[in-house]
């Protein structure tokens, strides 16, 4: 099984990449977030290799968290790799985890190709889903979104409102996330 590939980028589209590795060019399907994170010449991607009757496909990820969400989603009956990539192109892994924890079905339905039935099934199947990486992870502190969520809870905000406020925030530090979330929370009350 292929776990990762490193090579030269021959062609890059928003959701697809041609990667030349040792004289062989691979077509790898990627999310929009992974595409944005990649350079123009070289890339190293974590790979999920799916073997189906009709095709052998490679799906690439710039981060382990994105790969973990993808691998979890494709195990759900009725959610295929295209739907999983659509979710990951719409939401970052921390935002997706917040949506699942808040049971925000409407946010999930904003993903192209995800209707009420699929959104409900995903919510049921992923109840209790956590983005924390398995043992051996270098991260010893919780993700910045988890820190922000806890800080907002300590200020007395309800978890449902916090989850809505944290959606689509692109900030990368706890302080920036909390600032943006507080602005959103003022309009949500």
Curated annotation (Swiss-Prot):
UniProt keyword annotation of DNA-binding present: yes
Stretches the record annotates as Flexible linker: 138-139
Location (main, coarse): cytoplasm
Biological process annotations from GO: DNA recombination; DNA repair
Parts forming coiled coils: none
Record keywords: Cytoplasm, DNA damage, DNA recombination, DNA repair, DNA-binding
Subcellular location per the Swiss-Prot or TrEMBL entry: Cytoplasm
Domain II: annotated span: 63-138
Gene3D superfamilies xrefs: 5' to 3' exonuclease, C-terminal subdomain, DNA helicase RuvA subunit, C-terminal domain, Nucleic acid-binding proteins
Family: Belongs to the RuvA family.
Record comment regarding domains: Has three domains with a flexible linker between the domains II and III and assumes an 'L' shape. Domain III is highly mobile and contacts RuvB.
Job description of the protein: The RuvA-RuvB-RuvC complex processes Holliday junction (HJ) DNA during genetic recombination and DNA repair, while the RuvA-RuvB complex plays an important role in the rescue of blocked DNA replication forks via replication fork reversal (RFR). RuvA specifically binds to HJ cruciform DNA, conferring on it an open structure. The RuvB hexamer acts as an ATP-dependent pump, pulling dsDNA into and through the RuvAB complex. HJ branch migration allows RuvC to scan DNA until it finds its consensus sequence, where it cleaves and resolves the cruciform DNA.
Oligomeric form and interacting partners: Homotetramer. Forms an RuvA(8)-RuvB(12)-Holliday junction (HJ) complex. HJ DNA is sandwiched between 2 RuvA tetramers; dsDNA enters through RuvA and exits via RuvB. An RuvB hexamer assembles on each DNA strand where it exits the tetramer. Each RuvB hexamer is contacted by two RuvA subunits (via domain III) on 2 adjacent RuvB subunits; this complex drives branch migration. In the full resolvosome a probable DNA-RuvA(4)-RuvB(12)-RuvC(2) complex forms which resolves the HJ.
Protein name, per record: Holliday junction branch migration complex subunit RuvA
Primary gene name: ruvA
């Amino acid at each position: 099984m292929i776990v990762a590939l490193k090579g030269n980028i021959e062609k890059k589209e928003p959701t697809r990449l041609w990667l030349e590795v040792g004289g062989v060019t691979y077509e790898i399907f990627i999310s929009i977030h992974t595409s944005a994170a990649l350079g123009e010449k070289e890339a190293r991607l974590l790979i999920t290799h799916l073997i189906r009757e009709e095709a052998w496909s490679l799906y690439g990820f710039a981060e382990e968290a994105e790969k973990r969400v993808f691998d979890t989603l494709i195990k759900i009956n009725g959610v295929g790799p295209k739907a999983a990539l659509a979710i990951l192109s719409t939401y970052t892994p921390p935002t997706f985890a917040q949506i699942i924890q808040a049971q925000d079905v409407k946010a999930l339905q904003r993903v192209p190709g995800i209707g009420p039935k699929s959104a409900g099934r995903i919510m049921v199947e992923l109840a209790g889903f956590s983005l924390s990486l398995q043992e051996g992870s270098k991260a010893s502190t919780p993700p910045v979104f988890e820190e922000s969520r806890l800080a907002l809870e300590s200020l007395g905000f309800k978890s449902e409102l916090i989850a809505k406020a944290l959606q689509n925030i692109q900030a990368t530090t706890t302080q920036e996330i909390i600032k943006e979330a507080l602005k959103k929370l003022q309009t949500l009350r």
